[in-house]
Amino acid sequence: MKIAIIGAGAWGTAIAMLLARNNYRVTLYTRHSAHTQEINQLHTNKKYLPNIILPNIIKATSSFSDIVDHEIIIIVTPSDQVRATIKNLKQHGISNNAIIGIASKGLDHNQSKLLSDVVKDYLANNPLFIIAGPNLANEVAQGLPCALTIAAIQKEVRFNISTLFHSPNVITSTTEDIITIQVASAFKNIIAIIAGIIIAKQYGQNCKASIITQGIKEIVAFARAAGSTNPDISEFAVIGDLILTSYAITSRNTKFGYDLGQYEYYTDLSNNTNPNLIEGIKAAKILYPLTVKLNLNCHIIYCAYSILHNGGKISSAIECMLKKINHETK
């Protein structure tokens, strides 16, 4: 079986290692020839996973022509690159039988769509699955225990993809609810930023836990509005991923929120950070107008948007959010 992964960052490489440990040969696509040479010759990916040796059966390429004939193609690019990646696959003549996986987190930046809908725009006949879970890429690469949720509408796809990943160290669950998992993947980075700010501003762990709980409510509300009839928050990829992202200070979005919480305005920190690397910044910009349009009380989204995109004072935005949540629960 030929399996390709597009995106040789930390998470894409970690996914490749999970498959390689189950003796599947994996082709890892990266745009940079030097990166390809490092993976193929040294079996390392030092920029993203230092001190990790990659299995020899992982091979890298910088040519789309090398992967379009693969039976399974998993996309692990930043969310704002998914549409271009799908278009590229179509232009290179990908088979209608190829199974497309999405492991990217976030929403489409051009049309504010779920990433699964972007795939349908160009590859409507291809089977599709979403893969996510509460995993830090470095721990997965080390071979530590982890859990994954495989979401697909077709039962056969769910079963087959789950079987590829399952091992004594990898717990897999399956669901047909592809909507809630994608919504949670977008929301969780925003919630993590606010959680990081909460701790930096010394509101305490109680407040942080309350914000995470509110975040779950907002995920459910948005998922229903997006078409999920019965949002399943119990999956590893929903509540599990949210807990990990919000509580692990090594998580990129939580760390960003904590650093941001040392200041009063985003502009005080923005010169020292690359917003393209913080998915929560991009997600807040996309989700804010959608939640307003859908008339949803997503107070965490409104707070994050105010801070990150509307010049809001951080402490004032947090206080406003807490008051609105408090008022709503009465």
UniProtKB/Swiss-Prot annotation:
Question: What EC number(s) would the UniProt record show?
Answer: 1.1.1.94
Q: Which UniProt keywords are listed?
A: Cytoplasm, Lipid biosynthesis, Lipid metabolism, NAD, NADP, Nucleotide-binding, Oxidoreductase, Phospholipid biosynthesis, Phospholipid metabolism
Q: In which pathway does it act?
A: Membrane lipid metabolism; glycerophospholipid metabolism
Localization: Cytoplasm
GO function term, MF aspect, one? NAD binding
Positions annotated to bind NADPH: W11, R31, H32, K105, A137, R252, L277, E279
What's a Pfam family this protein contains? NAD_Gly3P_dh_N
Any single Gene Ontology cellular-component annotation: cytosol
Q: Which reaction does it catalyse?
A: sn-glycerol 3-phosphate + NAD(+) = dihydroxyacetone phosphate + NADH + H(+); sn-glycerol 3-phosphate + NADP(+) = dihydroxyacetone phosphate + NADPH + H(+)
Checking PROSITE patterns in the record gives: NAD_G3PDH
A single GO BP term for this record reads: phospholipid biosynthetic process
What is the similarity comment for this entry? Belongs to the NAD-dependent glycerol-3-phosphate dehydrogenase family.
The record ties this protein, via NCBIfam families, to: PRK00094.1-2 (NF000940), PRK00094.1-4 (NF000942), PRK00094.2-5 (NF000947)
Q: What does this protein do?
A: Catalyzes the reduction of the glycolytic intermediate dihydroxyacetone phosphate (DHAP) to sn-glycerol 3-phosphate (G3P), the key precursor for phospholipid synthesis.
* UniProt name for this protein: Glycerol-3-phosphate dehydrogenase [NAD(P)+]
Per the UniProt record, the source organism is Orientia tsutsugamushi (strain Ikeda)
- What are the top taxonomic ranks of the organism? Bacteria, Pseudomonadati, Pseudomonadota, Alphaproteobacteria, Rickettsiales
Q: Which gene encodes it?
A: gpsA
